Every structure is written in structure tokens, then in C-alpha cells.
Design a protein with these regions (language model features):
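Periodic glycine anchor positions in long extracellular repeat architectures
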Residues: 67-70, 167-170, 207
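Alpha-helical bundle protein-protein interaction modules that mediate dimerization/oligomerization
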Residues: 154, 161-179, 183-187
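Low-complexity, intrinsically disordered regulatory regions of RNA-binding proteins
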Residues: 1-64, 72-157, 188-231
Length: 231
């Protein structure tokens, strides 16, 4: 069964792999935005050789990704070596943006969820995979999304970056589709969540597991890394 990231909010607690309850932190309102008014965090520079990804997560699931006092997101950072930050969103947004910044060089082998296969990967690839795996764990409890279903992942990118993914006449994206076996769509502007910038477009990759291959082939065919920027 296909699931999306647009499920209605739920009030149940999130359970970790140990079976212990991991309630959504009280510091976050039901839409995932902070209850307390506070200045926005300073921008994060993207060092040379690093790549930045902005992942979309429904607000009803973001508490389970963050964890109580940030314990889960801190563990994800420790495990992958990535910088991970949940960005503030307008109160009208049903989604939050998870910013992932990590080295783009391939330097490790990782196991893919639901498979005994190990693949070579960069810290960026591993971090994106692990964040989405956590989102799916939360979704299974909060929204009853069954394991093994076809689930898509959605990322935000600036229009100029999306142009590099598509290529002239759609040649690049078609080659990535053939090589990875994934379905890739650039969604129309009216489907953008309010947490997106006016210069953003949304890329959907399905099934989510192919995000690993998609990132690899994206680098290979476009040579495009999102460097020296502030987020």
C-alpha cells in the first residue's frame, strides 16, 4: 500500500527499537513548530566537499525524529557524521524541513534496511537514508503505515538545481530513472508546502530506498554538489 507524508497528526507516543516510549517533545506544537517564540538559529555554512539536502517530514512525525531533548537526532548525527537540523516552519505548514549536511566522498559501507546487501556510500547518503528510515519507523506507529509498503521521499531543491537533475530535454533524469529503477518526479509549484521557499521545487523519489542510488547517479551524471552555501 502506498503511503505519503500527508497523514493527519496523531497523539500517540512513538516507540523506539527498544520498545520504550519516546513521546513527542512538549517543546513542539502539534504542527511541529516551536511553541516558544525565539530568534531563528544562525545559518549553517556548507564546507567544500560537503553536500546539503533538505528533506520533507510531516509535522505529526517530527517529534519522533527529534526525540526527547533531541536524543534521536543527536544519535543520527553521531552514527553518520552528518550535521542534521530541523528548520523552523510557518505555523500554517503541515511539514518541517530536515537539513542534512555531510561529506560527499564515498568512504564507508552501509547496510540497506530490509536487505542483507552492503553498499559503498558517503556520509551524506547514509545520513539521508537513516533519517528517512527513522521517519518510516515513526509513521508505522503514528499513522499505521505498514512496513514493506511503497513509500516515497520528498526533497526540496532550488529551481537551478532541479534543472541539473532534469537535464536538457529530460535526458539526465531519464538516465537516472533507468540506472536506478526509481520513479522520479518534479512536483508542480501548487504542491509545494508553505515551509518551502519561493525559489524551491520539490523532487519525489519512489520507492524511498532508491534515494541511495539516486544520490549516487545524481552526482555521477550532473557533477553537481551544493557547496559553499548558507542554510
Amino acid at each position: 500500500m502506498e503511503a505519503s507524508f500527508l497523514s493527519p497528526p496523531a497523539k500517540r507516543s512513538i516507540y523506539t527499537a527498544t520498545g520504550m516510549p519516546d513521546p513527542i517533545p512538549m517543546a513542539y506544537a502539534p504542527n511541529g513548530s516551536s511553541k516558544r517564540s525565539k530568534p531563528p538559529p544562525p545559518p549553517i555554512p556548507v564546507p567544500a566537499g560537503h553536500v546539503a539536502f533538505r528533506l520533507l517530514c510531516h509535522a505529526s512525525r517530527i517529534g519522533g525524529v527529534i526525540g526527547k531533548s533531541g536524543v534521536i537526532v543527536k544519535q543520527l548525527q553521531s552514527d553518520t557524521g552528518a550535521r542534521i537540523r530541523v528548520e523552523d516552519s510557518p505555523s500554517t505548514s503541515d511539514h518541517r524541513v530536515i537539513l542534512v549536511i555531510a561529506p560527499a566522498s564515498v568512504n564507508r559501507r552501509i547496510a540497506l534496511q530490509g536487505s542483507s546487501e552492503e553498499v559503498e556510500a558517503s556520509a551524506a547518503q547514509e545520513a539521508v537514508l537513516r533519517v528517512f528510515e527513522r521517519i518510516l519507523e515513526v509513521a508505522a506507529v503514528v499513522d499505521g503505515v505498514p512496513p514493506g509498503g511503497v513509500v516515497s521521499c520528498r526533497l526540496l531543491a532550488e529551481t537551478s538545481q532541479v534543472g541539473s537533475v532534469i537535464g536538457k530535454g529530460g535526458k539526465v533524469v531519464e538516465k537516472i530513472r533507468r540506472e536506478s529503477g526509481s520513479k522520479i518526479k518534479v512536483l508542480t509549484a501548487e504542491k509545494l508546502p508553505t515551509c518551502a521557499a519561493s525559489t524551491d521545487e520539490m523532487v519525489e523519489v519512489k520507492p524511498f530506498l532508491f534515494i541511495y542510488l539516486w544520490i549516487s547517479l545524481f552526482f555521477q551524471f550532473t557533477g553537481y554538489l551544493w557547496l559553499s552555501r548558507l542554510y
